[in-house]
C-alpha cells in the first residue's frame, strides 16, 4: 500500500478484515481465531513501543490467523480479498488469486530413557547396547562473577551498537541473543545497563504474559566473561517458532537489531573516543 498515511490505512484495513471475519464466523457457528497477527512492514511494527512516530507513505501488510477449522481460515481469506478489492485506496498486490488455508505443523521434542531404545546394526538388534542411565548432578552450578562495578559518577548514554556486535536466532519457541563487546573494557557498562528488564521492555510485544512481571520471567541472562559477551535466552517469544509461527520473523533473527538501539550508560571518555571514530556504528 502506498500514499499518504499508509500505515494508518493499512492498520484500519487489517482490523476491518478481522472484524468482518469474526462476524461471519459467529453467523455460521464457528469459534473465534486462536491467534491473529498484523505486521506493517515499513512502519516499524517490529519495534513495538520503541517505534518512531512518523508518517510513512509505503508499507507492506502481513496479516495472518490461526483457527481450529480450515473453514474458519477460508472465511478470513475471503474477507481479505473482498475488503482488499473494495475499500482501501492505494492498495496493490504482488500475488494473483486467493491464498489457501494451510495446516500448522509443530515440532514436539522430548526426552526418554536410553534404556527404552534398542540399537540395530545391519537390521539385527545389538544385544549389548543397553546404556546405564546417567543421573543428574546435584552439584551447585558455578556461575562467573559479575563484572567490576562502574566507578565513574558521570555517565552518558550511548547506543549499544557503538559498543558491541549482536546476533540472534531461534531454538524452538525460544530465542537466543548474543552480545559481544567490541572491547573488553566495555563489558561492565553493557552488563549493568542491558539488564533482563531492559531486554524484556524492548521485546515485550513479542513475549508471552499478561503483565510485565510475567514477561520478565521469560528472560534469562548469561555472562561469558572470557569473550566479553552476554547471552540472553527468551522463552515463549516466537509465537510457536519456525513453521508453527505466523509471524514475519518466526526465528527472531531481527531481535538483536532491536537491542542495538538500547542506551548504555558509559563514561564520558568512552563516548568521546567512540564519537571520534567514524568506522563504528
In which residue ranges do the predicted regions lie?
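Eukaryotic N-terminal low-complexity, Ser/Thr- and Lys/Arg-rich leader segments
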Residues: 140, 280-281
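C-terminal non-catalytic interaction/assembly regions of soluble proteins
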Residues: 1-157, 180-185, 192, 200-226
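Helix-rich interaction surfaces within compact, conserved domain-sized segments
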Residues: 213-280
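Short secondary-structure capping/turn segments at boundaries of alpha-helices and beta-strands
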Residues: 163-168, 218-220
Amino acid at each position: 500500500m502506498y500514499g499518504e498515511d499508509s500505515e494508518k490505512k493499512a492498520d484500519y484495513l487489517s482490523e476491518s478484515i478481522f472484524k468482518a471475519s469474526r462476524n461471519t464466523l459467529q453467523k455460521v457457528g464457528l469459534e473465534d481465531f486462536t491467534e491473529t497477527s498484523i505486521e506493517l512492514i515499513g512502519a516499524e511494527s517490529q519495534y513495538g513501543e520503541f517505534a518512531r512516530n512518523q508518517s510513512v507513505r509505503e508499507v507492506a501488510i502481513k496479516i495472518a490467523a490461526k483457527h481450529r477449522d480450515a473453514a474458519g481460515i477460508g472465511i478470513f481469506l475471503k474477507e481479505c480479498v473482498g475488503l482488499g478489492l473494495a475499500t482501501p485506496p492505494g492498495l496493490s498486490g504482488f500475488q494473483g488469486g486467493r491464498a489457501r488455508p494451510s495446516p500448522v505443523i509443530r515440532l514436539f521434542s522430548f526426552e526418554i530413557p536410553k534404556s527404552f531404545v534398542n540399537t540395530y546394526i545391519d537390521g539385527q538388534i545389538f544385544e549389548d547396547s543397553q546404556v546405564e542411565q546417567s543421573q543428574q548432578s546435584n552439584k551447585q552450578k558455578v556461575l562467573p562473577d559479575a563484572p567490576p562495578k562502574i566507578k565513574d559518577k558521570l555517565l552518558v548514554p550511548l547506543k549499544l551498537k557503538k559498543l558491541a556486535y549482536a546476533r540472534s536466532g531461534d531454538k524452538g519457541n525460544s530465542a537466543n541473543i548474543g552480545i559481544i563487546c567490541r572491547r573488553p573494557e566495555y563489558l561492565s557498562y553493557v552488563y549493568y545497563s542491558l539488564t533482563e528488564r531492559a531486554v524484556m521492555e524492548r521485546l515485550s510485544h513479542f513475549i508471552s504474559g499478561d503483565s510485565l512481571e510475567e514477561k520478565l520471567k521469560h528472560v534469562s541472562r548469561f555472562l561469558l566473561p572470557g569473550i566479553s559477551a552476554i547471552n540472553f535466552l527468551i522463552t515463549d517469544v516466537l509465537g510457536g517458532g519456525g513453521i508453527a509461527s505466523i509471524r514475519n520473523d518466526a526465528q527472531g533473527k531481527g531481535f538483536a537489531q532491536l537491542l542495538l538501539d538500547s542506551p548504555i550508560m558509559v563514561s564520558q571518555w568512552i563516548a568521546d573516543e567512540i564519537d571520534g571514530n567514524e568506522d563504528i556504528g
